[in-house]
C-alpha cells in the first residue's frame, strides 16, 4: 500500500475519533460501570475522556507525519563481481499484541503496525471490551472508507485459555 493511502487511513481515523468522541466515551462508560471496584491506577488507564481522545488523535497525526518505513533501503553494496546486496525494511506480516486496560493502545499500536505495513491482531483486557471493540470498528471504518480491507486491524475476543492456545499453536517450530 502506498504511503499516501496509509496516511489517508490514519487521517480518516483521526476524524472519526473526533466526530464520534461521545460514542467512544459512552462505550468506555459501559466498561467503567462493569468494573466499579478497580484501583485508581486501573481507573486511570481505562478511562477515556476528551484529553485521552485528543492524545489518540495526536498519536495518529504523529505516525502519519513519520516517513514510511516500508521498503526503505537501509544498506546497499555492489560487490566487485557486480552482485548487488541490499538490506531493505519489510513488514513482519501479522503482529499480535496482548495488552490490558489501555484502550488507547488499540489506536496507537495499530497505527504503528499499519504504517509499517503490518496487519495487527489486538487482544485487550476484558475490562476495556466495549471501548476496544468500538475503537476497532472505527479503525475498520477508516479502512473501508479508503477502499482497504478490514483485516489490517482485528480485535480478538478470546478468553485466557483461548489466548494461550493461540500463542501455543503459532509458536510451534520457533522454539
Q: Where are each of the predicted segments found?
A:
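Conserved active-site and cofactor/substrate-binding residues in soluble primary-metabolism enzymes
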Residues: 5-8, 19, 23, 51, ...
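Intrinsically disordered, low-complexity linker/loop segments enriched in Gly/Pro
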Residues: 147-150, 160
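Secondary-structure boundary motif
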Residues: 19, 144-145, 168
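N-terminal Rossmann-like NAD(P)+-binding subdomain of aldehyde/semialdehyde dehydrogenases
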Residues: 1-85
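Conserved small-residue-rich beta-alpha loop and adjacent elements
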Residues: 58, 65, 69-141, 146, ...
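Conserved NAD(P)+-binding/catalytic subdomain of aldehyde/semialdehyde dehydrogenases
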Residues: 94, 154-175
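Short glycine-enriched loop/turn motifs at secondary-structure junctions
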Residues: 40, 90-91, 170-171
